[in-house]
Amino acid sequence: MTNIAAVVLNWNKPELTIDSVDSILKIDQSGFKLKIFLVDNGSSDNSLELFRQKYKSNSQVEVVATNSNLGFVGGNNFILYRLIKDKYSHFLLINNDVLVDPHFLKNLVKNTPKYQLLSPKIYFAPGYEFHADRYSKKEKGRVIWFAGGKFDWDNVYGSHIGVDEVDRGQYDQINDQVDFLTGCCLLISRRVFEKIGFLDEKFFMYLEDADFCQRAKLNDFKMAYVPDAKIWHINSGSSKSGGDLHNYFLTRNRLLFGFRYASLRTKLALIKESVVQLLNPSISKWQKTGIKDFYFQKFNKGSWQ
């Protein structure tokens, strides 16, 4: 039987995280075993106390503390280093800002004989769309956030297939030609970790999932987007996009990712782009810091405090 360890990472969002964990606890678990590891990633609030009180009598949830903020990558690796020594066949990385369909994991699991990495169809939670005023009340809850990932390799930009589209069945086929899956919800065979290692802590957060997927593909593992597995994402519930943190890590990590996997022509274009941006007064301080930190090889948290 498939034996799954689910990892849910929290940082100062206890109510959001509890809603997510409780949603997972209600799923159809026929055909597999599931244990949830709720990892508090150095929260400065009372998250840890709340979790321990809430789940103290629930043997299906184990609360774990990192005692410092290790980032998305380090927080997940913190528990994965331990769990890989146990008998779990698969590991589910899932955000603390999602609500899940009762059958989502069962529908992922049924595809594990063929694929080693799997992500579901992910909708925006109603009201959390990028452009909420575009949609009718009936359409909200059916607006796609992720239906697979694709890369513009010439410019090193990743995008979500179907994002902002109302689901009308246009992405209802399994897609195993995606460039990447999302760490928002990613089911991974233990064989992948055993072969390629864990998430790369150089990234700290952002693009670590794309890097992991590229390493998996280069080692002949198969991945797929699974449309009949469905969850809802409370967009920016766990980290705000567009701010300094987002600008810093995405800028630096895009260069890190591009210099690993893009063509020589694209790498040369990235160097030219970096020079232009450093000289551009309209580019933010944290974007420029991200560029500098890449070239000075300051990874993980880098200059971010």
Segments predicted by a language model, with ranges:
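Short, acidic, metal-binding catalytic loop of nucleotide-sugar glycosyltransferases
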Residues: D22-K33
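A conserved acidic beta->alpha catalytic loop
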Residues: S23, D40-E49, S68, V98
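Acidic donor-binding/catalytic loop of UDP-sugar-dependent glycosyltransferases
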Residues: N46, D97-N111, S119
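Glycine-rich, basic loop-to-helix element that forms the pyrophosphate-binding segment
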Residues: A65-K85
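Acidic/His-rich active-site region of diverse nucleotide-sugar glycosyltransferases
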Residues: G74, N107-I196
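Short beta-strand-to-loop acidic/aromatic patch adjacent to the donor-nucleotide binding site
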Residues: K87-L99
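A short, conserved alpha-helix in the catalytic core of glycosyltransferases
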Residues: D179-K230
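Non-catalytic, C-terminal membrane-associated alpha-helical segments of glycosyltransferases
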Residues: D244-L255, F259-Q305
